[in-house]
């Protein structure tokens, strides 16, 4: 007797009541012996770094639609947790995010876009949990060392100001704060941070540590009772669904505080579907946080399209609601932080897993996944082979769930396009005459959610505009008097921080500019370049003309560049190749084939000094390139054979103040 049938290709998706005797595993879902661990939610990371960079430039209504798919309850991913980078001015994977304190006496709580993003998330879901975590720190924190623990009080003060600023300027309550992403922790610093938070009346802000591996933080907590007391959650990254004995012995909440990081294809969706269940089944992790929230960065940067959805074309408005959004919905739309897992969770006989959660008020949500090995391999760690095959799974509801009359059914099938379904609602399942028992026929690469809740929905908007390449002619004069965001559209800083700037002393043509504002190397998380650089455009550009007005602020030692065909960014920025046209305050110019300046095509003298505006022009066509200063040719037809294509860019010789204006690029692929 088939209770409900949705179609999957030409085959039915049967839900069978117990009246039909079928072989297979039997799984009891029961709360008679109490409940399991408290569920803390499903979330995603914005940052680590600059992963939401292009999102802010999207025109309406598309930007709001993207945000709805991510945060709006019972619409799309419906995330419970948003974790953001506390910008520290350093390169943190796909770019830099600005600090709220570039310098020791500087405070600005409107830089970057994480404040805005948190407010947009809260606007859609007032109950969303907010987390902050630093990847890099501004250089002054280290007092000459590439280390944030030189002065523990100073670093704790810096983090505390971010939390206080979030509340004072944006009315945002930060719920959790981390230590240092995937880097060393300092036991005394964690204690100092807790004391400082308490002193500031921030007792409610919980500490999560150490956003790296389970060890040595777990063992350290077992050996230090004060440390054990001040850490609320142990957060591990990419745990492969498993934890360690020491972590469990702490009796603290265990989270996969960064996971996924996989191309958002159906394989990435399968990865997410598997770990959302098995992080708890195997490792007792009660929250899973995906990196990253939305792939809103140039796709050729590291980890392209490793977000829950893709929004990397603000110039066209095009975005893609990828399958991980709907895999997330299977859990997020039918649970809430504060629900509890049942103790009766586990693996299916022929592969896959099941979890069940309750709000303690009679509601029940069951999530069953049968992700195959080939369909669910995450980017890391290595996934040992396992087999999943067709099976029947019989579930028996006992305890307070034995009287449930009806379950709503939601279904996903990943893989072949002809059989593919994403978050499809099937007919509900009636249990009144079934002795609270039902059987699922399961194929591989499926997800079922069965729930008493009727709130689920597959949200949708009209299709966004079609995909378009970056405009071949693009210009920006940076003439923005009161910018809503601190950074100019589409520029993606890869080392250094480039911000809108107002020249109070220059009422003329260059009153509003883009300025590189770091004068000191940050405490780095990745291999930042020794030069600052911001990229823009289409990675496929080959023939292009870049023109920009430039202003060197540092006498004698200062220098700036414009560039084309820049072929690397993110954590690989130090080794970027391209064609770079430099001028220096000492009256010299240089043409190099790399950002580091090792490959020199030409050099010589020019009439250049600091504190004066110049117009640089770089022309690249085929195998030849030329450069002009104030409209006069400085070098011409220099052979350049590599790379064949890449972004346009601007930047400085070192961590120094410099300004850019009237940027213009004209390109062909």
Curated annotation (Swiss-Prot):
Family from the record: Belongs to the glycosyl hydrolase 59 family.
Keyword list, A-Z: Disease variant, Disulfide bond, Glycoprotein, Glycosidase, Hydrolase, Lipid degradation, Lipid metabolism, Lysosome, Signal, Sphingolipid metabolism
Glycan-bearing residues: 363, 387, 543, 586
Keyword Aminoacyl-tRNA synthetase: no
Its biological purpose: Hydrolyzes the galactose ester bonds of glycolipids such as galactosylceramide and galactosylsphingosine. Enzyme with very low activity responsible for the lysosomal catabolism of galactosylceramide, a major lipid in myelin, kidney and epithelial cells of small intestine and colon.
Disease field: Defects in GALC are the cause of globoid cell leukodystrophy (GLD). This deficiency results in the insufficient catabolism of several galactolipids that are important in the production of normal myelin.
InterPro entries assigned to the protein according to its UniProt record, in alphabetical order: Aldolase_TIM, GH59_C, GH59_cat, Glyco_hydro_59, Glyco_hydro_59_dom, Glycoside_hydrolase_SF
Any Pfam family matching the protein: Glyco_hydro_59M
Reaction(s) this enzyme catalyzes, per UniProt: a beta-D-galactosyl-(1<->1')-N-acylsphing-4-enine + H2O = an N-acylsphing-4-enine + D-galactose; beta-D-galactosyl-(1<->1)-sphing-4-enine + H2O = sphing-4-enine + D-galactose; a D-galactosylceramide + H2O = an N-acyl-sphingoid base + D-galactose
Gene: GALC
Cellular component per GO, a single term: membrane
Record-given protein name: Galactocerebrosidase
Positions of the catalytic residues: 182 (proton donor/acceptor), 258 (nucleophile)
Organism: Canis lupus familiaris
Disulphide linkage map: 271-378
Record-listed substrate binding positions: 93, 135, 181, 380
EC number(s) recorded for this UniProt protein: 3.2.1.46
Signal peptide limits: 1-26
Location of the protein in the cell: Lysosome
The organism's place on the tree of life at top rank: Eukaryota
């Amino acid at each position: 007797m088939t209770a409900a049938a949705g179609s999957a290709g030409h085959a039915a998706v049967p839900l069978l009541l117990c009246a039909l005797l079928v072989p297979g595993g039997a799984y009891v879902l029961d709360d008679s012996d109490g409940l399991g661990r408290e569920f803390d939610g499903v979330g995603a990371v914005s940052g680590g770094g600059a992963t939401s960079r292009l999102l802010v430039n999207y025109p309406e209504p598309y930007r709001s639609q993207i945000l709805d798919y991510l945060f709006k309850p019972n619409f799309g991913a419906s995330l419970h947790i948003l974790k953001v980078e506390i910008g520290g001015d350093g390169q943190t994977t796909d770019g830099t995010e600005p600090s709220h304190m570039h310098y020791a006496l500087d405070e600005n709580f409107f830089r970057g876009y994480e404040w805005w993003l948190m407010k947009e998330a809260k606007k859609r879901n007032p109950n969303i949990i907010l987390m902050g975590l630093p990847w890099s720190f501004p250089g002054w924190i280290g007092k000459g060392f590439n280390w944030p623990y030189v002065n523990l009080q100073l670093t704790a003060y810096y983090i505390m100001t971010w939390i206080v600023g979030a509340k004072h300027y944006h009315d945002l309550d930060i719920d959790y704060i981390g230590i240092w992403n995937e880097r060393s922790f300092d036991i005394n610093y964690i204690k100092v941070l807790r004391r400082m938070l308490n002193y500031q009346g921030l007792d409610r802000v919980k500490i999560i540590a150490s956003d790296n591996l389970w060890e040595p933080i777990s063992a350290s907590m077992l050996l230090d009772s004060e440390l054990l007391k001040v850490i609320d959650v142990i957060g591990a990254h990419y745990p492969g669904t498993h934890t360690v004995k020491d972590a469990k012995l702490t009796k603290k909440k265990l989270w996969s505080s960064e996971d996924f990081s996989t191309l958002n294809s159906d394989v990435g969706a399968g990865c997410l579907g598997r770990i959302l269940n098995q992080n708890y089944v195997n490792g007792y992790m009660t929250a899973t946080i995906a990196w990253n929230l939305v792939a809103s960065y140039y796709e050729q940067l590291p980890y392209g399209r490793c977000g829950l959805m893709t929004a990397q074309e603000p110039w066209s408005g095009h975005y893609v609601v990828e399958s991980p959004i709907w895999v997330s919905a299977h859990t997020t739309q039918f649970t809430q932080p504060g629900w509890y897992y049942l103790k009766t969770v586990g693996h299916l006989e022929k592969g896959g897993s099941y979890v069940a959660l309750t709000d303690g008020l009679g509601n029940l949500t069951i999530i069953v996944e049968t992700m195959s090995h080939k369909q669910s391999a995450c980017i890391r760690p290595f996934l040992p082979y396992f087999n999943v095959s067709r099976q029947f799974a019989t579930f028996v509801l006992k305890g307070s769930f034995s009287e449930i009359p009806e379950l709503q059914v939601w279904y996903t099938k990943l893989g072949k396009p002809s059989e593919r379904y994403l978050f499809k609602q099937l007919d509900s399942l009636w249990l009144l005459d079934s002795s609270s028992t039902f059987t699922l026929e399961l194929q591989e690469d499926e997800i079922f959610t069965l729930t008493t809740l009727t709130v689920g929905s597959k949200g949708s908007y009209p299709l966004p505009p079609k995909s378009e390449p970056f405009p071949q002619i693009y210009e920006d004069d940076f003439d923005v008097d009161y910018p809503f965001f601190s950074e100019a559209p589409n520029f993606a800083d890869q080392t250094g921080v480039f911000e809108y700037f107002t020249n109070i002393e220059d009422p003329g043509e260059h009153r509003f500019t883009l300025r590189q504002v770091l004068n000191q190397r940050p405490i780095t998380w990745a291999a930042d370049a020794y030069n600052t650089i911001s990229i823009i455009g289409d990675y496929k550009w080959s023939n292009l003309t870049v023109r920009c007005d430039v202003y060197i602020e540092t006498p004698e030692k200062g220098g700036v560049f414009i560039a084309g065909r820049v072929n690397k960014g993110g954590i690989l920025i130090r080794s970027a190749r391209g064609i770079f046209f430099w001028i220096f305050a000492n009256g010299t110019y240089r043409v190099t084939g790399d950002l580091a300046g090792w490959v020199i095509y030409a050099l010589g003298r020019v009439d250049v000094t600091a504190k004066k505006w110049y117009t640089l022009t770089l022309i690249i066509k085929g195998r030849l390139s030329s450069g002009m200063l104030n409209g006069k040719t400085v070098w011409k037809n220099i052979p350049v054979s590599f790379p064949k294509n890449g972004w346009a860019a601007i930047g400085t010789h070192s961590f120094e103040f410099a300004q850019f204006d009237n940027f213009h690029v004209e390109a062909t692929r």
